[in-house]
Amino acid sequence: MLFRSIPSTMLGYKKDLPDYDYDPQKAKALLKQAGLEQGAEVTLWSMPVQRPYNPNSKRIAEMIQNDWAKVGVKAKIVSYEWGEYLAGMRKGEHDSALYGWMSDNGDPDNFAGTLLSCDNIQTGSNAARWCDKSYDALVKKALLVSDPQARAKLYEQAQEIFYQQAPWITLATGKTFYATRSNVSGYTVSMMGSDFSKAKLN
């Protein structure tokens, strides 16, 4: 269940949204509706680096390319040096691209706002360059609310809009594993980094 604007571990994750259907015929109909009955040609940017959420960008790009070809979208896979790739994404030079994010602070706004707010089109962190005023209002309101349950409801409403509009498709989430020896105690794994202040060797 990846079709959300925030990860399942965060406040406000909406569990009850159904998966998108696999429907090539509907995809063709939508292309026709957009005036692209004869198909389309696009570039698909593939990251030149491995990331926890995307260890093989080239292979994933090839799989997408293959699926899109079935509905008449011809994708040319391109890649650039990582710095150039990031700069191009921020400027909106891509037609479509593989991209990802890892939370800086564990707050849902670090996904819902940082990656999708209208304001962040200009900063470049909204790589989808999507702006929905209703979504934006919910996310901005959530920043001003201190009650966790009230915040969660606002993010859930925002995710419904995200789900309907689909400014991006979440393909995968990464899992990071930490191992400790049996003689280590007091070490707690944290999404915000490693804290060894209470760790001991027994």
Residue ranges and their predicted role:
Residues I64, V71-V73, A179, V184:
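Hydrophobic aliphatic residue packing
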Residues R4, A34-P52, E93, A97-W101, ...:
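Bilobed periplasmic-binding protein-like "clamshell/Venus-flytrap" ligand-binding domains
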Residues K15-D23, V49-I60, I77, E81, ...:
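Extracytoplasmic/periplasmic, Sec-exported soluble proteins
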Residues M1-N66, K70, L138, Q157, ...:
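Append "and occasionally in soluble cytosolic enzymes with long acidic Gly/Pro-rich linkers
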Residues L44, N66-N120, L154:
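Periplasmic binding protein-like
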Residues L11-K26, L36, G88-G92, G113-L144, ...:
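Short, solvent-exposed loop/beta-turn-alpha elements that line the ligand-binding surface or hinge
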Residues F3, P24-L31, K58-A61, Q65, ...:
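Extracytoplasmic/secreted envelope proteins and their assembly/folding machinery
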